[in-house]
Regions:
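A cross-family glycoside hydrolase active-site/sugar-binding cleft signature
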Residues: 71, 105-107, 165
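Serine-dependent acyl-ester chemistry module
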Residues: 57-59, 67-82, 110-144
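Short beta-alpha junction loops
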Residues: 99-100, 106-112
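Conserved SGNH/GDSL esterase-like catalytic core that processes O-acyl groups on lipids
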Residues: 2-86
Length: 224
């Protein structure tokens, strides 16, 4: 890891700040699985969309990571998209002030479980008992709206993004989770999905302009 006053070392330390995907992905083992020399990965989990306290703990370390993947879970949708956007902008600002590379991550898509899955029938019962409970359609609608904003924001601010949704969805026009990536409940992923996600991390890291973030270490960022 790098000290605030030092240039990045050859070995770069990357943290994934997220929830269930990071845990089951076994993110810390990804460099070994993919033969990625020069990287160490760490997963830090935090339930709930607001990860401010956990992020501050990471940023206050004596030796901070070189990059942080900012990942949110589909379970937090539908939600207050305006608040979610404001929080994500704050996370990016805090990372930049610390000279850490913020890497945005889209939310993985969801789907209705197959009719032969127990979760499918559980969802029907829940709709009857809790009619105000968010539907899968509502969850998908909000998370794709958030993803669209996140991709636009990454372009505006010249930030790299790992597009989990694109890797896992059926198509550009059908943004549901692919059936062969469904862990069984329409929300969580299976081993095939995680193997697919392994393949999109390194290309993202290779595009990072690490020197850009060294220059802002300890300075006030102008990114909105």
């Amino acid at each position: 890891m790098t000290n605030p006053s030092e240039a990045l070392s050859e070995k770069r330390d990357v943290v994934l700040l997220g929830a269930s995907i990071g845990f089951y992905w076994k993110f810390e083992d990804l460099p070994k699985r993919m033969g990625m020399e020069g990287y160490t990965f760490e997963y830090i989990g935090e339930d709930g969309f607001d990860k401010s306290k956990t992020l501050q703990k990471i940023l206050s370390r004596p030796n901070r990571p070189d990059a942080i993947f900012l990942k949110q879970c589909a379970a937090y949708f539908p939600g207050d998209l305006v608040q979610y956007q404001a929080l994500m902008k704050t996370y990016v600002q805090e990372c930049l002030k610390a000279g850490i590379v913020p890497i945005l991550v889209t939310v993985a898509p969801v789907r209705e479980p197959g009719i032969f899955k127990l979760q499918y029938w559980k969802n029907i019962v829940k709709k009857i008992i809790y009619p105000s409970r968010p539907t899968v359609e509502a969850r998908l609608r909000d998370l794709t709206a958030y993803n669209d904003w996140l991709k636009k924001y990454s372009l505006e601010q010249n930030l790299e993004i790992v597009d989990l949704e694109k890797a896992l969805r059926i198509s550009d026009t059908d943004r549901r989770l692919r059936a062969d990536f469904d862990g069984g409940d329409g929300l969580h992923l299976n081993s095939n999905a995680y193997a697919k996600l392994d393949q999109i991390v390194m290309p993202t890291l290779e595009k990072v302009d690490w020197n850009r973030f060294i220059r802002v270490r300890g300075q006030t960022s102008t990114i909105d």
